[in-house]
Amino acid sequence: MRVGLGYDVHKLVENRKLILGGVEIPYEKGLLGHSDADVLLHAIMDSLLGACALGDIGRHFPDTDNKFKGISSIKLLEEVNKLIIKNGYIINNIDSVIIAQKPKLAPYIENMRVNISNALNIEIDKINIKATTEEGLGFTGSMLGISSQSICSVIKK
């Protein structure tokens, strides 16, 4: 068994959609990034790539490549899954946390789990997502951005 750790952060800005776990969340701001800036999926992808010693999302989907401009991170997650399978790994589990002062994310977590389960073609009980705040501290607490952390375990076939 191997484990991987992922982390991502993006700045909150006006005139962008807020996408987390492939779910569009109603909010006055969204995350700034080259793709859809889905911090949850970016952290998950980095944890999976790390567990398989396949680098990180910047290596596979560079922000200097216009073909990834505005792309759905669900599509990128599907590509990461193909790489994992090609290299002989099976996902054992994923545990993630989203750190955001606002908006409240609990109502959207199950839909995020469904999206991730579908993109990775794994059972939903292998995916856990939590949401928390930093009690008004730091850049997430002052609502300047949202971050996410993810850990996963994979098994070599």
Curated annotation (Swiss-Prot):
Its EC number is 4.6.1.12. One of its GO terms (biological process) is isopentenyl diphosphate biosynthetic process, methylerythritol 4-phosphate pathway. Binds 1 divalent metal cation per subunit. Coiled coil: none annotated. Gene3D superfamilies: 2-C-methyl-D-erythritol 2,4-cyclodiphosphate synthase. CDD domains: MECDP_synthase. Pathway: Isoprenoid biosynthesis; isopentenyl diphosphate biosynthesis via DXP pathway; isopentenyl diphosphate from 1-deoxy-D-xylulose 5-phosphate: step 4/6. It comes from the Bacteria. InterPro entries: MECDP_synthase, MECDP_synthase_CS, MECDP_synthase_sf. GO terms for molecular function: 2-C-methyl-D-erythritol 2,4-cyclodiphosphate synthase activity; metal ion binding. NCBIfam families: ispF. Involved in the biosynthesis of isopentenyl diphosphate (IPP) and dimethylallyl diphosphate (DMAPP), two major building blocks of isoprenoid compounds. Catalyzes the conversion of 4-diphosphocytidyl-2-C-methyl-D-erythritol 2-phosphate (CDP-ME2P) to 2-C-methyl-D-erythritol 2,4-cyclodiphosphate (ME-CPP) with a corresponding release of cytidine 5-monophosphate (CMP). Belongs to the IspF family. This is 2-C-methyl-D-erythritol 2,4-cyclodiphosphate synthase. It comes from Clostridium botulinum (strain Alaska E43 / Type E3). The gene is ispF.
